[in-house]
Amino acid sequence: MTAHLLPPGIEVFERGWLSANNIFHYGKDDVSLVDSGYCAHQKMTLDLVSGAIKKHGLSALNKLVNTHLHSDHCGGNAALAEVFHCEVYIPAAEEAAVKNWDSALLSYDNLGQECPQFSHHHVLVPGEEIVLGRYLWKVLAAPGHDPHSIMLYQADHRILISADALWEEGFGVIFPELWGEAGFEEVAQTLDLIETLPINLVIPGHGAPFSDVAKSLATARSRLDYLASDPDRNARHGAKVLLKYRLLEWRSREIQQVNDWIANT
């Protein structure tokens, strides 16, 4: 339904919930990928990228861009960089944590998730622009789900890569609130920013691309009001999401191992 809304040179690899969507951009002078999925699925990510490069008669992957550094969005970074020797772009606010590979600052300890260590080459600064494939994209700050998250906006075709700031039926867990930091107001401000943009298509971090932005914003705001009215709801929701995510990765575990993971996360 949305394929015709994508201009030439953009392909969406819709994944699932364990791995974020990957957006493949290709043009004469640049081939880029936005987000790399979770490490447990890195072979699939490599196969998808290799297949797209072959299908379109390309020879390289030049850039790997991360909207944020939750492990479902950057878990394939190390593998992609090793195979394709691409340059890695991360949100500017995460630079020190990546340079020093601080798994606590990168939230992997708190979230009980894994991410193979990787290096970066460049940073993404809100307000600046970056060429991905054939088109110029503007970097937009999108705090809330993650304080350092960014979105990417293509003005000519009115496309927003929203990551986990907006899905068709909501948004990602507001993690900062779980460790006593602000998040609800930041989500509201990010939704307000999205509303100011002329948008024909949103490519979310999870789920299919969608075009009814007004409906999705209304759904997201309703969800935000529900969570913000009782912060314990957000905490319970976050805990359930983290457990479901881990179970998706494990598939099968002894109950004691699950209980141990819960106790240590």
PLM region spans:
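Active-site HxH/HxHxD metal-binding segment of metal-dependent hydrolases
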Residues: 40-44, 49-131
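Metallo-beta-lactamase
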Residues: 31, 38-40, 136-143, 147-228
